[in-house]
Every structure is written in structure tokens, then in C-alpha cells.
From Swiss-Prot:
Residue ranges annotated as Extracellular topological domain: 1-44, 96-115, 176-196, 266-281
Protein's recorded name: Sphingosine 1-phosphate receptor 3
Residues on Cytoplasmic side: 66-74, 137-154, 218-244, 303-378
Task performed by this protein: Receptor for the lysosphingolipid sphingosine 1-phosphate (S1P). S1P is a bioactive lysophospholipid that elicits diverse physiological effect on most types of cells and tissues.
Name of the coding gene: S1pr3
Native organism: Mus musculus
Tissue: Most abundant in heart, lung, kidney and spleen; low but detectable in brain, thymus, muscle and testis; and nearly undetectable in liver, stomach, and intestine. Expressed in embryonic lung from embryonic day 14-18. Also abundantly detected in embryonic nasal cartilage, sphenoid bone, vena cava, Meckel's cartilage/incisor teeth, genital tubercle and bladder.
Localization (cell): Cell membrane
Entry's transmembrane regions: 45-65, 75-95, 116-136, 155-175, 197-217, 245-265, 282-302
UniProt keyword Glycoprotein present: yes
PANTHER family (alphabetical): G-PROTEIN COUPLED RECEPTOR
Organism phylogeny: Eukaryota, Metazoa, Chordata, Craniata, Vertebrata
Organism domain of life: Eukaryota
Glycosylation site positions: 15
One term of GO molecular function: G protein-coupled receptor activity
SUPFAM superfamilies assigned: Family A G protein-coupled receptor-like (SSF81321)
């Protein structure tokens, strides 16, 4: 009967394989609604706006690190890589939302695996990046050496390994580890994914997070028990970064733990038995919000990053105001030339030297304007 139903609605449903799997786990009716699964237009717009905000703020982090030479060191390379992961997570989830609902059934299984796999690649890269940061901090604390800017090979090696592991984990379903034509093994949250694959991913990510916690606990013990002060190698900056990263890891665990628990429930439950699995979009959104919180943590916890952010924003504002104020400059110049025309032509060099002072004094006189004649008043 299900087959007859599918044949009668082939132009609407599109792919039989996807329809059969969604029907088996009980998500077919929800996906035929736009927005899917009981969502409203407001929540869909909210999710899309959140994803756009995630992309924008993480792009600002990358630009700030790229433009500021102080951030061209190991730790900020890792933070930049984490920002790149968060940026890609925002893009991947936005694409996922736009391709959901009825559009799901117009996808081939390969495109479906790419759509869902991109989220797992971003998650894997984020988790591995946090592990790489913990490894780097641990090695630095053990050696107690100043940072050598010329030795960056370890940084890029760790970052490369992060992405290699992430792509490998995300590609497993499309390479064959899935539940196509094996319905009892299908996940309810991701109907083409094998429950064994999801259990494997959760175990991998949990092991990574436990390793991260152990490494930071060891770093803390090294700092407390060491007779040498960390001030011997730029400690203020180092400890500020350490606090920032610990906060990032804590927020990561808080945001992703509910989704991990939901996946474990998915592995344990049979199809259509656990109603909470049909509300997975809220758990996924909480996990994606982690990508929006990381740049906020960088800004609040690091003075250097906060200054870089403000410079970046103020620089854009100054450029925008400068282009608007530039047409007024020719109108002001003749007044100066008239006042200077009463003097002898022999005094013209002196007039040129005094011009910057006039611009500065006009800044001081008019305190109500922060930008005047192309000059930024402080």
C-alpha cells in the first residue's frame, strides 16, 4: 500500500528511497509540510537569521586574526581554524534548512548524504580543533619555552589532521556505512544513517572530549605545582588564552551534550517509539548556537581580540563616513585659502605647515561631533 501511495504522488515526493526510509521511522508526514516537522515560518526565519549571524561574526574573527600581526601565532591559528569550522557549520545548517521539507524528497541519496555529512564534518573539525588546542597548550606547558614563530609546522600538521579526520568521519555513510534497504538499523533523526554509525560517532566524540578535559586538568595541575612562574614566557597572554579556551570547551560540552544524549536515545529506541526524537531540530539548533557563542567568548575573555574587533568595526565605520564627508572638503578649502591670501606669498610654506593644526583645533572646538572634515575626533 505504501508503494501504491508513492507511485500516485511521484511528482511530489520524488525519490522513493528517501520516502520509504522517512515513512519507516515516522517522519514522512512531517517532511511533507513546509516548514517541516511542525515548525512555523517564524522559527524557520529565526534559524536562518541565526545561521547568517554565525557566518558574519566568525568571518569577523578570521579577518581580525588575518589583519592583526599580534595574532599570527600558534594559539590564534587554532582559534582561527575553530572560527572557520563554526563558519562552515553556520553555512551547512543554513543549506540544510533550505533543502528540508518537501525539497528533501527531490534529493538523491548521495545529495542527502552530502547535506547531512557537511554538518558532521563541521562538528568533527570543531571537536578535533579543540583537541589540537589542548595538545598544543599541554606541550607548551611541559616544555616551558617561549614561543618560536618560525616553527609552525606542528600547528599546520595538527590542523591538517583535524580536517582529515573530520572528512573521513563525515564520508563514511556515503562510502557505504548506512542503512539503505536495512530499515531496522535506521536512525529516526537521520533516516538513512545507520544506528551503529551514530553510536560510533558519539563514542569517538565523547572520547575526544574526555581527552580534552584530562589534558586541561593536567595543565592546571602543572601550573599550580610548578615552582617556576608562567611569567617566564609571556604568562599574562598565555593564561588569558588558556582561560578563554577552557570556557570555549565548557560551552561546547554544554551545547552539544543534549544532542549527543538524543542520539543515544535514538540508538536505543525502535522506530516510532520515542516521541522526543521528532523534536530533534531544537537540539540541533542548540548545538549550532555553540558556533555563535565562540566569537562572543573570544571578545569578552580576550582584551586583544576585543580591541581587534573594535578596530575592525570602527575602521569600517570610519571608511563609510569618510566617503560621505569627502565632498565637503573642497567647500572648506577656499575659506582657508581666502584667509591665507591676505598674507604674503613668501609665507605660503608656513601656511601649509599650519593646516593640520587647524583641522585638529576644529576637532577640539566642536565636541559634539566625533567626525569632522575627514578627521576622527577622540
Amino acid at each position: 500500500m505504501a508503494t501504491t501511495h508513492a507511485q500516485g504522488h511521484q511528482p511530489v515526493l520524488g525519490n522513493d528511497t528517501l520516502r520509504e526510509h522517512y515513512d519507516y521511522v515516522g517522519k514522512l508526514a512531517g517532511r511533507l509540510r513546509d516548514p517541516p516537522e511542525g515548525g512555523t515560518l517564524i522559527t524557520t526565519i529565526l534559524f536562518l537569521v541565526t545561521c547568517s549571524f554565525i557566518v558574519l561574526e566568525n568571518l569577523m574573527v578570521l579577518i581580525a586574526i588575518w589583519k592583526n600581526n599580534k595574532f599570527h601565532n600558534r594559539m590564534y591559528f587554532f582559534i582561527g581554524n575553530l572560527a572557520l569550522c563554526d563558519l562552515l557549520a553556520g553555512i551547512a545548517y543554513k543549506v540544510n534548512i533550505l533543502m528540508s521539507g518537501r525539497k528533501t524528497f527531490s534529493l538523491s541519496p548521495t545529495v542527502w548524504f552530502l547535506r547531512e555529512g557537511s554538518m558532521f564534518v563541521a562538528l568533527g573539525a570543531s571537536t578535533c580543533s579543540l583537541l589540537a588546542i589542548a595538545i598544543e597548550r599541554h606541550l607548551t606547558m611541559i616544555k616551558m619555552r617561549p614561543y618560536d614563530a618560525n616553527k609552525k609546522h606542528r600547528v599546520f600538521l595538527l590542523i591538517g589532521m583535524c580536517w582529515l579526520i573530520a572528512f573521513s568521519l563525515g564520508a563514511l555513510p556515503i562510502l557505504g556505512w548506512n542503512c539503505l534497504e536495512n530499515f531496522p538499523d535506521c536512525s529516526t533523526i537521520l533516516p538513512l544513517y545507520s544506528k551503529k554509525y551514530i553510536a560510533f560517532l558519539i563514542s569517538i566524540f565523547t572520547a575526544i572530549l574526555v581527552t580534552i578535559v584530562i589534558l586541561y586538568a593536567r595543565i592546571y595541575c602543572l601550573v599550580k605545582s610548578s615552582s617556576r612562574r608562567v611569567a617566564n614566557h609571556n604568562s599574562e597572554r598565555s593564561m588569558a588564552l588558556l582561560r578563554t579556551v577552557v570556557i570555549v570547551v565548557s560551552v561546547f560540552i554544554a551545547c552539544w551534550s543534549p544532542l549527543f544524549i538524543l542520539f543515544l536515545i535514538d540508538v536505543a529506541c525502535r522506530a516510532k517509539e520515542c516521541s522526543i526524537l521528532f523534536k530533534s531540530q531544537w537540539f540541533i539548533m542548540l548545538a549550532v548556537l555553540n558556533s555563535a557563542m565562540n566569537p562572543v567568548i573570544y571578545t569578552l575573555a580576550s582584551k586583544e581580540m576585543r580591541r581587534a574587533f573594535f578596530r575592525l568595526v570602527c575602521g569600517c565605520l570610519v571608511k563609510g563616513k569618510g566617503t560621505q564627508a569627502s565632498p565637503m572638503q573642497p567647500a572648506l578649502d577656499p575659506s582657508r585659502s581666502k584667509s591665507s591670501s591676505s598674507n604674503n606669498s613668501s609665507h605660503s610654506p608656513k601656511v601649509k605647515e599650519d593646516l593640520p593644526r587647524v583641522a585638529t583645533s576644529s576637532c577640539i572646538i566642536d565636541k559634539n561631533r566625533s567626525f569632522q572634515n575627514g578627521v576622527l575626533c577622540k
